[in-house]
């Protein structure tokens, strides 16, 4: 017998501060709870379930949360265009799981399937238990500078701090990911043959 409950929630908000500055905040929640109940009657093969039957009960819960905030700038200065986004995000995941199996401990009364009927002993009962918490924190920035809609300079930078890096040399500084790219649209500067509808050169 299986049962699942799931909750999904998503929120977002945008605020246009000026004609060139926008603030944005987003958040997501995904929570799931699973329950598994397995019953093996005493008439089943003894090697599989023992003399009085076998009962397995598992509870699994996972909660994932994500949120980010960004400031976005979009502005034109004469022949130049500027498109910038700066922000931060957090990704959080919590997992809890417990699995109880009567196989090694046995049932006190045959074919009575509940936790109270399991003969709890050091050899059986809880054969799996998970309590895990993972978190990723990030800051990031992207910028594109354009000139006469024909040349573009793209810059990105991101720094991540992961809970898996705790007690390592990367715990405080995390990991930094920069990138630089340049794009050139020849058709904005040179008359192209009619059979060329679009051209682009890019280096990174």
Where does each model-flagged region fall?
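Outer-membrane beta-barrel translocator/channel fold
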Residues: 189-204
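Surface-exposed extracellular loop regions of Gram-negative outer-membrane beta-barrel proteins
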Residues: 4-77, 81, 134-167, 171-188
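Surface-exposed loop/turn segments flanking beta-strands in extracellular/periplasmic regions
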Residues: 1, 38-53, 96-126
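Outer-membrane beta-barrel signature, preferentially recognizing the C-terminal barrel domain
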Residues: 7, 117-138
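Short glycine-rich beta-strand segments
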Residues: 89-93, 185, 204
């Amino acid at each position: 017998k299986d049962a699942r409950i799931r909750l999904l929630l998503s929120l977002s908000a945008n605020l246009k501060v000026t004609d060139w500055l926008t603030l944005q905040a987003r958040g997501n929640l995904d929570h799931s709870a699973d329950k598994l109940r397995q019953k093996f009657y005493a008439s089943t093969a003894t090697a599989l379930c023992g003399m009085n039957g076998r009962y397995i009960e598992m509870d699994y819960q996972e909660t994932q949360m994500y949120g980010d905030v960004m400031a976005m700038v979009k502005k034109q200065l004469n022949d130049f265009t500027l498109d910038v986004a700066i922000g931060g995000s957090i990704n959080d995941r919590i997992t809890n799981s417990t699995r109880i199996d009567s196989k090694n401990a046995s049932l006190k009364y045959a074919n009575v399937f509940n936790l109270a009927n399991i003969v709890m002993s050091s050899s059986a009962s809880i054969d799996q238990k998970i309590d895990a918490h993972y978190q990723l924190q990030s800051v990031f920035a992207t910028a594109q500078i354009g000139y006469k809609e024909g040349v573009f300079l793209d810059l990105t930078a991101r720094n991540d701090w992961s809970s898996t890096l705790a007690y390592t040399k990367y715990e405080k500084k995390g990991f930094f990911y920069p990138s630089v790219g340049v794009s050139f649209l020849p058709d904005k500067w040179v008359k192209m043959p009619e059979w060329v509808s679009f051209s682009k050169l890019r280096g990174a």
